[in-house]
């Protein structure tokens, strides 16, 4: 071979070797990057991960706390509205009875037939008691009933006209009422002894 050709081939080999070493260097850098983390680096990564989890849990807690606070405020508002407007249904059902009473009062001023006025008042009373029953109010029975201190309050004791009426209610001075089976006013009664 010609010395020129030898030189040329030698140069080509040098160029190829330079390329090979240049290609190997980045691989060495990549190998270093892919190398396992040191103990210190691993601990730092775990710490960062733990802090991220803590931040996430803290955010969830704050959101849940705010949601519960809003729920509490909303239920308090609803409860206050129920207390203020709870009797609205009952009052609304009584209003027609009040209208009937107003008409009866006007009629009484000019009426000459007392019997008709009495019948009108009795009709209004019956209508009112029906409205009360619709709202859960019931009259406590007293006639010929034995004294029951859960429902009755004995305000007087008198001698019983017969042996069968001893310990029983002879007269009701004031009617008692229950609301949804809870006594709201005891019946005031006279008992035989």
Swiss-Prot record:
Keyword Cytoplasm applies: yes
Chief place where the protein resides: cytoplasm
Family to which the UniProt record says this protein belongs: Belongs to the GrpE family.
Biological role stated in the UniProt entry: Participates actively in the response to hyperosmotic and heat shock by preventing the aggregation of stress-denatured proteins, in association with DnaK and GrpE. It is the nucleotide exchange factor for DnaK and may function as a thermosensor. Unfolded proteins bind initially to DnaJ; upon interaction with the DnaJ-bound protein, DnaK hydrolyzes its bound ATP, resulting in the formation of a stable complex. GrpE releases ADP from DnaK; ATP binding to DnaK triggers the release of the substrate protein, thus completing the reaction cycle.
GO biological process: protein folding
Positions in coiled-coil regions: none
Protein name: Protein GrpE
Superkingdom, natural source: Bacteria
Region Disordered, residue ranges: 1-45
Subunit organization: Homodimer.
Localisation per UniProt entry: Cytoplasm
Positions with biased composition (Acidic residues): 23-32
Gene Ontology CC terms: cytoplasm
Gene3D superfamilies, per the entry: 3.90.20.20, Head domain of nucleotide exchange factor GrpE
One MF term in the entry's GO annotations: protein-folding chaperone binding
InterPro entries assigned to the protein according to its UniProt record, in alphabetical order: GrpE, GrpE_coiled_coil, GrpE_head
Compositionally biased intervals (Basic and acidic residues): 1-22
UniProt keyword terms in alphabetical order: Chaperone, Cytoplasm, Stress response
